[in-house]
Amino acid sequence: MSNMQQKTDVILIGAGIMSATLGSLLKELAPEWEIKVFEKLANAGEESSNEWNNAGTGHSALCELNYTSEKSDGSIDIGKAVKVNEQFQLSRQFWAYLVKRNLIRNPQDFIMPLPHMSLVQGEKNVEFLKKRFEALSKNALFQGMEFADAPDTLKKWLPLIMEGRNSNEPMAATKIDSGTDVNFGALTRMLFDYLKTKNVELNYKHSVENIKRAKNGLWEVKVHDMNSGKIEHHTAKFVFIGGGGGSLPLLQKTGIPESKHIGGFPVSGLFMVCKNQKIVEQHHAKVYGKAKVGAPPMSVPHLDTRYIDNKKALLFGPFAGFSPKFLKTGSNLDLIGSVKPNNVLTMLAAGVKEMGLTKYLIQQVMLSHEKRMEELREFIPNAKSEDWDTVVAGQRVQVIKDTDAGGKGTLQFGTEVVSANDGSIAALLGASPGASTAVHVMLEVLEKCFPERILEWEPKIKEMVPSYGVSLTENPRLFQELHASTGRTLGLNEKEAVHN
């Protein structure tokens, strides 16, 4: 019946990696809780979590240069890199816990060992990379990293990239074999298959139209069943909005004070994919370069081996694009619809501040296939246009908010949890490092929204995620033990990953 209210304990909006992770944690911590999932699309993991809609990097700051900045005194700040790496370790540990208990199977279908490399050109950049390597090498989380600036070593490490390179410009690379390629789409589908066995109600082709607080304090969620055309009303004590780019409009509908003065700026991504399997087989790594001066952090170019549908692929990008949609399957009215009286000044301030980003996006949108090939040839000098196609990746909505440090309308490059003061509702906003840190971010949701249960849950959390609440940097022996044990469980035999 359309007007009948259906009660439950927890509602998860969006069937992506975040809801899948939160649902899996809750089913282990509070198995008696009833959970319902509502997803607008026909299957799980079809938007940002889909394997073609993200880079599939197990982000652990092994190769991403934007996580290590050079300070004014010339030293390297590795704080952000350590933080991202520690967060990825939590994900590894939780996935290993699930595999060990046969709750999900065949880890090779969602995670593969793959060297992570950084590559730079030019004297200044080589100097930066050497300093970065020296700074990271002192930390246990980055053990095993190698540095090379000798052409012979670079040719061995990067045959495809070094072939046909005539420039005498200095080049250098770092390599670490403990990197990973993660198929977040496959992982998301596995987690929802597991949740189904735990009697979690999965509702596909169900679009959430509104979220409002009922008089009894529960959250009332209005859902459009796209299969039958009927409207349903569901109530829950706790709601999580994990709808990727679609989270901001839903958060705004809640009316909670924490949702005010927040805006979103959508950026679309394009990748070039190689269709010549002979070329694909000549590369075996994720190789990250350095963003061009003035380009935003999400524009770091990288040439990636990927494992999609158990087949090796080669992708280069990202190229940014602009679309007013908040989701790949969204509406052209998403951006304008998100402008409210409480955030219009924040949005306008960002517009003025981010003229450089706007100019960059316009330039990116105007690029022809041949212009994109020119950028690719900076990585692969011999690349041929006919070997490469362009694929459209997912939409990312960067958060805009007022901050003490940046002032009004500051663009945030990161992932952020916004929750009500009483912890009854939470939403995940933002982009990178995103899926890689899903376990860390969902544990943050539990801490913010269930503070009264955390002490009781802590032993179980530590069983699932042994380094929860512990700094692995300060406990190198624990890191080595956990890295080795999770590697065994997940089938990440690093030596097999080294390119011959």
Swiss-Prot record:
This is Probable malate:quinone oxidoreductase. GO terms for molecular function: 2-hydroxyglutarate dehydrogenase activity; L-malate dehydrogenase (quinone) activity. Its EC number is 1.1.5.4. NCBIfam families: mal_quin_oxido, PRK05257.1-1, PRK05257.1-3, PRK05257.1-4, PRK05257.2-1, PRK05257.2-4, PRK05257.3-1, PRK05257.3-2. One of its GO terms (biological process) is tricarboxylic acid cycle. Pathway: Carbohydrate metabolism; tricarboxylic acid cycle; oxaloacetate from (S)-malate (quinone route): step 1/1. InterPro entries: FAD/NAD-bd_sf, MQO. It comes from the Bacteria. The gene is mqo. It holds the Pfam family Mqo. Its cofactor is FAD. Disulfide bonds: none annotated. It is an enzyme of class 1 (oxidoreductase). Signal peptide: none annotated. It catalyses: (S)-malate + a quinone = a quinol + oxaloacetate.
